[in-house]
Amino acid sequence: MIEAHPAPIVRMAELEIEADQLEAYRPLLAEEIEASVAMEPGVLMLNAVALRDDPAQIRILEVYASQKDYEAHLQTPHFLKYKSLTSGMVKALRLVEVDPVLLRTKMG
């Protein structure tokens, strides 16, 4: 009998960071992403990029193994620390639900 695996949860977080806070924000984001990927088996991928012409516009492609893993991620100490420390830095946040067309990662 083949077990069905839940579909991954994929979303794009669109953030606008206060321009004068960008230098302080980036290491906090990096710390949160590193901890999430290293410590949470259900966090399959977190990739952050900045728009070239507007570096205060950050986009994060998030991939979680399941909805349960996403919800667990939101309760982790490292995510709660990130949210607390960056709350005054984030000018706007929009979570966009997306459907994966093709997700591939080259390891190594």
State where each predicted segment sits.
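Glycine-rich beta-strand-turn "strand-cap" elements at beta-sheet edges
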Residues: M1-P8, N47-A56, K83-G108
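An amphipathic, aromatic/His-enriched active-site/gating alpha helix that lines ligand/cofactor pockets
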Residues: A4, E31-L44, V63-V96
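N-terminal first-folded block
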Residues: H5-M39, L44, A48
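Short, well-ordered beta-strand segments in beta-rich or mixed alpha/beta enzyme
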Residues: P8-E16, M45-L74
